[in-house]
Amino acid sequence: MARLGVVGYGPLAWADGKRTADIEKVLGEGRVLWMETEHFKFGSNFGFARAPKDPKARRLLKGELKRLHKKCKKVPTSASKLDPWLRLHLYAQRAEELYDEFADLAGRPHGERRLGEKQKLLILLFEKKSDLARYFKSFCGRETQQTQRHTHYGTGHRSLVMTAEGDDGPRDSETTHAQFRYFAMQMFMDAAGGGPLWLQYGLGHVYEREVPCNMINCGVRADESVDLASQYEWGKKIRKRVKFEGLVVPFEELTTKTDLGYYGHVQAWARVEWMLQDRARFAEFLGAVLGKPSRARQVAALAGVYELEPAAFDAAWRKWCAKNYR
């Protein structure tokens, strides 16, 4: 158990003075697997899932299984089908690895609460939207069927509650994994003090898109025209748009923008990709704006770290996009 990074299994204490037994009274006893690791508490009723068909996604999964196998020889190094317990251990490993990567990127020292969170982070993985909706209504006072982050202000717990069911039915394992990465990186930024929305979204998309899938984790505004067949081909989209200055959101405007729309999300992703070409500089920029996301702070951090004024940043980024995306 310890070699897998597991601190313990259920029952567990949860948020707002509740326990996992209270959650099971609502969702049904024995329907959720509970587990605790160094930085997280998990609940999952994910069912069986097939391994990805995409070659890159299969290689990613095989690498994850090999890392788990090194910790516990009972874990297979490859699998065509993932059972509920294996999926839970995979997500626990994914969460801890992403946590450490974000903490390193943010320049946080090693320790029990590297990001400054008051409590362990909570992650709930539901197979169906109906279970997610019941949980949100009963324990968060919210009406939703969508994967979301939530803060329990009474006890200081931050949580990610997600479902493997989309509007068109069950999602495959790689799509669910990609969405998990997107929301997890945002939760970590919340725990570290919060940051500008474009940076939260952009960093989340960078990590999300490392897992091949055709899902997009953003909405399309009514005033935007997006071809559904190619909506996930962000490299092609941004390469075309940066040719025209009027089609990109200037950095100074992006710093405080709250409704990014589809193309704003694409641009946020591409800006973070450009900034991550120098990870040391990006880490310095991230550390400078965490908890201090004002426009003035972002502009000052850009000048101090990248030695660029906003207009020069826009020009350098557009030139890089035109050269590197196809």
State the predicted function of each range:
Residues W14-A15, V32, E36-P196, R295-A301:
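Juxtacatalytic substrate-recognition/specificity segment
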Residues D16, I23-E24, G47-A49, L88, ...:
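General structural signal for secondary-structure boundaries
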